[in-house]
Amino acid sequence: MCFWFAGSAFRYIFPFVFCDHVFELFLYTLRILRAFSRFILHFPHCFCIIQIRNPEYLIVYLALSTPQRKTKHSTYNNMKEGDFLMKYGHFDDVHQEYVITTPKTPLPWINYLGCNEFFSLISNTCGGYTFYKDAKLLRLTRYRYNNVPADINGKYLYIKDGDTVWNPGWQPTKTELDSYECRHGIGYSRFTSSKNGVKASVLSFVPLNDNCEISQLTLTNGSSEDKKLSVFSYVEWCLWNADDDMKNFQRNLSTGEVEVQDSTIYHKTEYRERRNHYAIYSVNTKIDGFDTSRDAFLGAYRGADSPEAVENGKCTNSMASGWSPIASHQINVDLAAGETKTFIFVLGYIENPEDEKWESYGVINKTRAKEMLAKYQTDAQVEEAFAALQAYWKQLLARYTVASADEKVNRMVNTWNQYQCMVTFNMSRSASYYESGIGRGMGFRDSCQD
């Protein structure tokens, strides 16, 4: 018989476990499978779906399917195994993507972006965090693991259309969308949603040769009338050491520093006294405002679900000094009926040699930042970088393929198991939504083992 685990909180899927005696399987494995949410048992003439609520309580669905009862119109005949396991989406084998069709998944479903030293975790609602090399010591953006509601803090884009404010990934405003789709691909994620005639598409990926994450926002006015929109970006900076960032408040609330030049926000906390690196968040167009103070952007007694600056339709041009620095751009967008406009946001990490830290007293050397940003100013440049990323993964996954009679085996072996293994190898399981990345870091044994 085939035993399929589908624990949505578990990072790994074990496709096949074989056992001769069902009751032995129950008695022996129930103790170690309590964390799994659901599994299906297949027998020669029936299958059994089991939902584990807690160790003492099981919900069991049994469907008999004997040869005598089967007909060509049988519901079971026309139903695939995946129909039970994919309530929230499906695999797209042609594009090697998993398509999530609702933002309201049981838990955040995340993808890993990055192949070399710069990594970003992104959920199906645009939550997540970003780091360079080490998720503890070089964390760019904050993430609160036990936050309520879950998965708040990420790389958010707010779209204000009159009195309606919404996000392409649904969170954090949770405004009901007219359509929603998230495609987690190999090294990238794409979000497509719409509200009141405006369609938004966001492509997020980490290019191969630069320490940055690209988010390409495409807005299309599908209505019959002109639209006046405002777009607000939002990331919250981590003060680099993610462990200390969550504890040492008496110091941390006094250290945040930023600079703003043109359309780029520079996060330079501790750059003056102890660091040779800073972070940037930029957009490839003239901005109509910005905020770098979280309190100024969100407002008193508010959260990311209802920022005061977005509600008012105007950023305050705040300059953070201590407290909680953020990066937010405001872009006012006029869209004629049928018109499309694209904006490219870049979140990046920059290092300077000790003798090249400053361009003048108290002003960071931005040369390397500007050189990197110059590579991602046009749609053609982004498309070229994205094509290079896809080509890299294509040649990597093509080194070993199988062609079996079972499409699920082909899908798992040719794409998702290999992708999972490479992500695990790159990060040594050091960072996820359940392994915070602030413990022992990249373990040597784990790296060798993976």
Positions of predicted regions on the chain:
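Short, positively charged and aromatic/hydrophobic N-terminal segments
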Residues: 13, 28-29, 38-45, 49-79
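Alpha-helix boundary/capping motif
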Residues: 21-24
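Anionic coordination/interaction segments
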Residues: 56, 61, 68-447
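RNA-binding accessory domains that recognize and position tRNA/RNA substrates
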Residues: 450
